[in-house]
Amino acid sequence: MQKRHRIQFPKPGLSTTPQDEAYFYLQGSGGQRKIRFHDYDEIYQIQGLYEQIFYDRLKCSSPSKVASILESSVKQTDINFSELRILDLGAGNGMMGEELKKRGVSRLIGVDIIPEAYDATVRDRPGLYDAYYVEDFTKLSAEKKEEISSWQCDCMVTVAALGFGDIPTRAFIEAFNIIKEQGWVTFNIKDTFLNIGDETGFSKTIRELIFSKYLDVYHIERYRHRLSIEGEPLYYFAIAGRKNADVPPEFFDSKGIRI
């Protein structure tokens, strides 16, 4: 039976912390530890803690939602969903990979920037991925890029990892360009990041990509990603589309976006 951890959230009304700075307290024999939600290197080292916080307490639904819209989008074509070769960018400890495997996907390649994510996947979900790379996609060597490309992935997924500095824009575009033309691209993003008033580089990049010739959008849906620590719903967009071509650097230059 999975060990239950003693965790405590800040008292309601006392915390005005932004979503990317939210934190909790972990109670243990050595006392109380304050851990930020985005301190994944710490969270992954403690078996079951990630699942208990984000799925049991905060009711995260994103892996199932994103997998669902990917599957429904692919079914609009004559492609067999189970034959997709999927690159899971920001794979973490394998929650999204596990959801895809449940739906019959046979080929999964994981990527994350922190070794703790890989270690947690091997510990908790051994054998889930055909390969798992600990790599920074903003600094990917030609040799490593060729190795990852050799898997001939025709789909990229990324869940709950965009827009808060977890996966930089350049890394997202690098992964987009690695998958094959006519491949599938599925991700989720906080709803406010699609507001036209958000002028941050990441938001502008995603908006420009969605409405560009490089991606055909098949499905976009606003849904409840999870609850905040105050119990309020946090809404995201889930987006699924099909890649038409690699995105060249000059595309972003022409839009005044630095990646």
Task: Identify what each model region corresponds to.
Residues M1-F37:
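N-terminal auxiliary segments of SAM/dcSAM-dependent transferases
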Residues C60-S82:
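Conserved alpha-helix/loop element of class I SAM-dependent methyltransferases that forms part
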Residues F81-G92:
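Conserved class I S-adenosyl-L-methionine
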Residues L87, M95-K144:
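Class I SAM-dependent methyltransferase SAM/SAH-binding core
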Residues R170-E181:
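A short glycine-rich, Lys/Arg-flanked "PGG" loop and its adjoining helix->strand segment in the class I
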